[in-house]
Curated annotation (Swiss-Prot):
Subcellular location: Cytoplasm
Top-level lineage group: Bacteria
Name listed for the protein in its UniProt record: Urease accessory protein UreG
A GO CC term assigned to this protein in UniProt: cytoplasm
Species classification: Bacteria, Thermotogati, Deinococcota, Deinococci, Deinococcales
Subunit structure: Homodimer. UreD, UreF and UreG form a complex that acts as a GTP-hydrolysis-dependent molecular chaperone, activating the urease apoprotein by helping to assemble the nickel containing metallocenter of UreC. The UreE protein probably delivers the nickel.
Encoding gene, per UniProt annotation: ureG
Gene3D superfamilies: P-loop containing nucleotide triphosphate hydrolases (3.40.50.300)
Alphabetical GO biological process terms: urea catabolic process
UniProt function note: Facilitates the functional incorporation of the urease nickel metallocenter. This process requires GTP hydrolysis, probably effectuated by UreG.
Binding positions for GTP per the UniProt entry: G10, P11, V12, G13, S14, G15, K16, T17
Similarity comment: family membership: Belongs to the SIMIBI class G3E GTPase family. UreG subfamily.
GO molecular function (one): nickel cation binding
Matches recorded under InterPro entries: CobW/HypB/UreG_nucleotide-bd, P-loop_NTPase, UreG
Record keywords, A-Z: Chaperone, Cytoplasm, GTP-binding, Nickel insertion, Nucleotide-binding
Length: 213
């Protein structure tokens, strides 16, 4: 069986690992799943997910890239490919595999040879102007996640402005690539990400995700 492979990218501190923890908890009873994390010199994200008991430890694998993590998910994904193959060998029924890596809006795109789809996580604390700047992560990711909406009042960010700018950047002709707003502390928006995975990627008969606010 070939699992659906979903890349999870975004800057350090944007909430990628926290999102993975939530998604694993929500999906582990529905699907046979695993996670690969990428770090430059450590296995910190692997340890965080293991300590949180997001999945059984053997289902959480860390890749130490020794350089910019985006290289290991785009230019030379061999380390990740080997880890994918190892997980498939150990878990033949694997249905869903998340591959997480840090990187900014320009660097954090995934090779189509490594993943079937990818999402990009950005942080409201970066300011309301961030979606307006565009870039590959914001424009071309299969799903844009605008995280930490609870911080908007603290940094003077207007979520309505971010929504309008994200919609403009994500528009492709008559279509708008999906994007969601999340607050992982309250769980807001998590259902929309799961709906995207199940409706858009796994083709389950579920309600499609709502776009934007």
């Amino acid at each position: 069986m070939t699992p659906l492979k979903i890349g999870v990218g975004g800057p350090v501190g944007s909430g990628k690992t926290a999102l993975l923890e939530v998604l694993c908890r929500e999906l582990r009873d529905r699907y046979d799943l695993a996670v690969i994390t990428n770090d430059i010199y450590t296995f910190e994200d692997q340890r965080i997910l293991t300590r949180a008991a997001a999945l059984a430890p053997e289902r959480i694998r860390g890749v130490q890239t020794g350089g910019c993590p985006h290289t290991a998910i785009r230019e030379d994904s061999s380390l990740n490919q080997e880890t994918v193959e190892a997980l498939q060998g150990e878990f033949p029924g694997l249905e869903l595999l998340f591959i997480e890596s840090g990187g900014d809006n320009l660097a954090s795109s995934f090779s189509p040879e490594l993943v079937d789809a990818w999402l990009f996580v950005l942080d409201v604390a970066g300011g309301e102007k961030v979606p307006r700047k565009g870039g590959p992560g914001i424009r071309h990711s299969d799903l844009l996640v605008i995280n930490k909406t609870d911080l908007a009042p603290l940094v003077g960010a207007d979520l309505r402005v971010m929504d309008a700018d994200a919609r403009a950047q994500r528009r492709a002709g008559d279509e708008v690539r999906p994007y969601v707003f999340t607050n992982l502390k309250s769980g807001a928006g998590v259902d929309e990400i799961i709906a995207w995975i199940e409706h858009d990627l796994l083709f389950r008969d579920v309600t499609p995700p709502r776009v934007g606010l």
